[in-house]
Amino acid sequence: MSLFDFFKNKGSAATATDRLKLILAKERTLNLPYMEEMRKEIIAVIQKYTKSSDIHFKTLDSNQSVETIEVEIILPK
């Protein structure tokens, strides 16, 4: 992999794969009642300050006690 490949846009297949991983990871995690509400609040705050509606959450790592979530924000031009 070269440095130029790092900045290359993903194809639709890679994007679909990432979304499927997110769905599967979410189903495997502990079902904490406040997690979905917290995600909604985070989205509202990000939209308030960036005017972006393109916000994605990704679960990076999950085990029985810890869930790591990455937030990807596409800023408008």
From Swiss-Prot:
UniProt keyword annotation of Cell division present: yes
Source organism, top-level taxon: Bacteria
> What InterPro entries does the database record attribute to this sequence?
MinE, MinE_sf
Residues crossing the lipid bilayer are: none
Keyword annotations: Cell cycle, Cell division
Extract the Pfam families matched here: MinE
- Function, as annotated: Prevents the cell division inhibition by proteins MinC and MinD at internal division sites while permitting inhibition at polar sites. This ensures cell division at the proper site by restricting the formation of a division septum at the midpoint of the long axis of the cell.
Which family is annotated? Belongs to the MinE family.
Name this protein carries in UniProt: Cell division topological specificity factor
User: What organism, scientifically named, is this protein from?
Assistant: Helicobacter pylori (strain G27)
